[in-house]
């Protein structure tokens, strides 16, 4: 419960710092497509929407399908999903911080510095957290848990969360998969314990 309350506190602080958006930013590439899909005849002159729907399958297909049936046209419902995914993301990073920091206050400060002081400090706006519900937020929430389980050397949940992240945003899952696999191989080669490499999970 303490981790949940701490994650909720982080969410409240980040909301004050970054705000919350609906129908703007990257959501402008998703919501019109969903609306046009459910209301034939709308956005007929919009080349992006027409091309998106005509393409059938793309990197947002899974997220698009889920959001369509999870209340995309209800702002309050979209905010609830944003809240849940954000809290899950923060909890994962609190768990990661706990692997190297024993004091709860220092764990909180370490994670808070990532999501508050580190905002807009990455290359190409590739943030860990987004102030709107988009595929990258959902994928990075799952990928953060994958990273935690990888650090704990629990490879079954690691690969499960990676697969989920990959379905939600392929590049997020693929990038973390490559990084963790290479890191595992390098570490185990150095330690001369190649037999303990989780080949079955990697192949799956």
Where are these regions (language model features)?
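Start-transfer (signal-anchor) and selected internal transmembrane alpha helices
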Residues: 1-13
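Perimembrane helix-loop-helix junctions
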Residues: 176-204
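Hydrophobic transmembrane alpha-helices
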Residues: 90, 94, 98, 144-152, ...
């Amino acid at each position: 419960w303490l981790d949940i309350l701490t994650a909720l506190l982080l969410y409240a602080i980040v909301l004050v710092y970054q705000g919350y958006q609906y129908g703007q930013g990257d959501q402008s590439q998703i919501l019109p497509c969903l609306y046009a899909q459910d209301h034939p005849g709308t956005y007929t002159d919009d080349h992006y929407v027409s091309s998106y729907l005509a393409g059938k399958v793309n990197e947002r297909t899974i997220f698009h399908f889920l959001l369509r049936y999870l209340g995309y046209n209800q702002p309050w419902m979209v905010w609830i999903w944003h809240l849940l995914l954000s809290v899950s993301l923060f909890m994962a990073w609190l768990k990661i911080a706990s692997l190297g920091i024993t004091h709860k206050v220092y764990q909180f400060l370490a994670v808070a510095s990532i999501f508050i002081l580190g905002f807009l400090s990455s290359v190409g706006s590739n943030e860990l957290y987004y102030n709107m519900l988009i595929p990258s937020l959902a994928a990075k929430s799952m990928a953060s848990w994958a990273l935690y389980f990888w650090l704990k050397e629990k490879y079954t949940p690691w690969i499960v969360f990676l697969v989920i992240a990959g379905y939600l945003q392929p590049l997020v899952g693929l990038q973390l998969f490559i990084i963790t696999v290479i890191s595992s191989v390098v570490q185990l080669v150095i330690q001369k314990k190649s037999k303990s490499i989780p080949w079955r999970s990697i192949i799956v």
